[in-house]
Design a protein with these regions (language model features):
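Transmembrane alpha-helices
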Residues: 134, 138, 170-204, 231, ...
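Short cytoplasmic-facing helical segments at TM-TM junctions of multi-pass membrane proteins
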Residues: 147-189, 213, 217
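Glycine-rich helix-loop "coupling/hinge" segments at transmembrane-helix boundaries
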Residues: 123-124, 199-236, 255-263
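Transmembrane alpha-helical segments of polytopic membrane transport and secretion proteins
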Residues: 1-24, 245-263
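Generic hydrophobic transmembrane alpha-helix motif, especially the helices
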Residues: 107-143, 150-151
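C-terminal transmembrane helix and the adjacent membrane-cytosol boundary/short C-terminal tail
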Residues: 96, 153, 184, 230-263
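Transmembrane-helix boundary motif in ABC transporter permease subunits
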Residues: 76-106
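Periplasmic/extracellular loop-to-transmembrane helix junction in inner-membrane transport proteins
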Residues: 9-11, 35-79
């Protein structure tokens, strides 16, 4: 009974209030970390972090070119990874020989940090934007392939058998059964893929980038401009959160037929 009352009380508090409480908690924690001699270098005062926007965007004119350069690399790399990953995942799930040939290598490369194969990519693709896109594409491809593959092989076998009994061929089975049932996994793969693309930025932009969020974070850390570096780190996090919110919005629209469970 007490548990039910607690759940009801939590449910009555609007989400915006929880968001405000979360932000307030983060600000308070940041304040104490910025005053602690042990952590003050890693967490400069928030006013200095906010001032870093003026420093990087207005005084130096670096911020927006960095954002555009990174979004270009992330966008192209993610799209290529998605376009390659989804078909490969379906082929692996549908044809066992393809699975037996590709799956060991996908699992092998997936466990290698992107930073480890950056030198190989640079040797093959050269220095610059092309190498960045290739690194992000590889990381995204691996994540999307594994996620979508798991979705396809977990489609209810009863649905497939029922469609076969009704005379569905492979094309009809894919369009009417497999693809709709896998849609939630594809959306999850997109969300994970974007997250992986953003976290791969620093590794990707170590290939000789002249602009970019990841490159700038690394450059600022080398000269100990901690406030500016922290500002860029926060920007990467904000971009990831915005992408997550947008994808959740479309997920609710595309998978409204699914039963939802509040946690």
């Amino acid at each position: 009974m007490n548990k039910e009352k607690k759940v009801d009380i939590v449910g009555k508090i609007p989400k915006w209030a929880w968001l405000c409480l979360s932000l307030l908690s983060a600000v308070v924690l940041w304040f104490f970390l910025s005053k602690n001699p042990t952590t003050s270098l890693s967490f400069p005062p928030l006013p200095e972090v906010f001032k870093a926007y003026h420093t990087m965007a207005v005084e130096r004119g670096k911020f927006w070119p960095d954002v555009l350069a990174s979004m270009r690399s992330v966008g192209i790399g993610f799209v290529l990874g998605f376009l390659f990953g989804v078909p490969v995942a379906f082929l692996m799930a549908w044809y066992r020989p393809v699975r037996f040939i590709l799956e060991p290598w996908i699992q092998f490369v997936r466990n290698i940090p992107p930073l480890a194969y950056v030198p190989l990519v640079v040797l093959a693709a050269g220095v610059g934007a092309k190498a960045q896109i290739v690194v992000i594409c590889i990381a995204t491809f691996l994540t999307i392939t594994v996620t979508v593959f798991q979705g396809v092989i977990n489609v209810d076998e009863t649905l497939i058998k029922a469609a076969r009994v009704l005379g569905a061929n492979d094309t009809v089975l894919f369009v009417k059964v497999i693809f709709p049932a896998t849609t939630p996994f594809i959306i999850t793969a997109v969300r994970l893929g974007i997250s992986v693309a953003l976290t791969t930025l620093i590794a990707a932009e170590s290939t000789g980038a002249v602009a970019g969020l990841g490159m700038r974070i690394k450059a600022l850390s080398q000269v100990f401009e901690n406030a500016e570096m922290m500002f860029y780190i926060i920007v990467v996090g904000v971009i990831g959160m915005l992408a997550e919110k947008i994808l959740k919005f479309f997920e609710r629209r595309l998978t409204s037929w699914q039963e939802k469970r509040e946690i």
